């Protein structure tokens, strides 16, 4: 099918076809992503309601299914008020600087074999680079707002993101060591080889099992990176109201909100790709092989997003010093230690990744 589309596009658009095809694939990711964010918020409210033994949204549409549409319309109709004391240029560009990296990172995430916007060999390096850019938008928002609450939230966010990116980086290096490739498709394919995969039990050959500490560190660090509960001291309502977003309203505020939920989906998709076999089914059986790989990736992402929500419903917010201690004194030594263990494992006779 892809070959037919490529042939038709080349004949129709000529030399412009590569650019047109890239734009089409980008739109095919961005539009469903926006819909996913809307209904992820509904799922979050429904699941937390169920955990709290209440109904959650149930008034707009059947079973509250139109609640996200109502929320979007509400934000679109709200006036974007720019306070007089802000630095206007930085104030306006900050939400875009937070949102753009969250969307750009989807360019290299494989939905199934050869199904991605850009299949670059340095995909893992691209992920590490792009994921670090969002913090600049947060710092700009805090500085430009000319508010002590916004500035304090921005400083917390920058320190927290930098602290946990180190542990996440070490986890990614470990994945690179055992797979020998920076290409995300190669990383998925490498997880579906070996003894257990040869016997049809793919789930036991995925990276989560031999790299279990890295799997836990990467996902928990991802929760901290996205400033989600219990690491949401950046916008701690009882301390600094909304943190770096306090002076934003309407669609400007919605862009920050959108970026947060897109980043949740990004972390879940990357965790599924790097540690949970990506688009592969857990069991190599005829009854499961007919299901498209894209569907398996969606299931894994959905389950990981539900863990995000469960953490919010179950745990109290940590103090800021506890969050810093977890990142610097526990996660970084743990990842460095396991990095050494994996390095020794790779050169030993018991190397399971040969």
UniProtKB/Swiss-Prot annotation:
Q: Where in the cell is it found?
A: Cell inner membrane
Keywords (A to Z) from UniProt:
Cell inner membrane, Cell membrane, Membrane, NAD, Quinone, Translocase, Transmembrane, Transmembrane helix, Ubiquinone
One GO location term (cellular component):
plasma membrane
Q: Where are the transmembrane segments?
A: 23-43, 91-111, 124-144, 162-182, 203-223, 250-270, 291-311, 330-350
Q: Drop me one GO molecular function for this one.
A: oxidoreductase activity, acting on NAD(P)H, quinone or similar compound as acceptor
| Listed GO biological process terms | aerobic respiration
User: What reaction does this catalyse?
Assistant: a quinone + NADH + 5 H(+)(in) = a quinol + NAD(+) + 4 H(+)(out)
Q: Using the UniProt record, name the top-level EC class of this enzyme in a single word.
A: translocase
InterPro entries linked to this entry: NADH_UbQ_OxRdtase_su1/FPO, NADH_UbQ_OxRdtase_su1_CS
Write down the membrane topology: Multi-pass membrane protein
**Annotated EC:** 7.1.1.-
Record keywords: Ribonucleoprotein included?
A: no
Where would you say this protein principally sits, based on its record? membrane
Protein function: NDH-1 shuttles electrons from NADH, via FMN and iron-sulfur (Fe-S) centers, to quinones in the respiratory chain. The immediate electron acceptor for the enzyme in this species is believed to be ubiquinone. Couples the redox reaction to proton translocation (for every two electrons transferred, four hydrogen ions are translocated across the cytoplasmic membrane), and thus conserves the redox energy in a proton gradient. This subunit may bind ubiquinone.
Fill in the subunit field for this protein.
NDH-1 is composed of 14 different subunits. Subunits NuoA, H, J, K, L, M, N constitute the membrane sector of the complex.
Q: Which family does it belong to?
A: Belongs to the complex I subunit 1 family.
- Name of the protein in question: NADH-quinone oxidoreductase subunit H
Lineage, highest ranks first: Bacteria, Pseudomonadati, Pseudomonadota, Betaproteobacteria, Burkholderiales
Q: Which gene encodes it?
A: nuoH
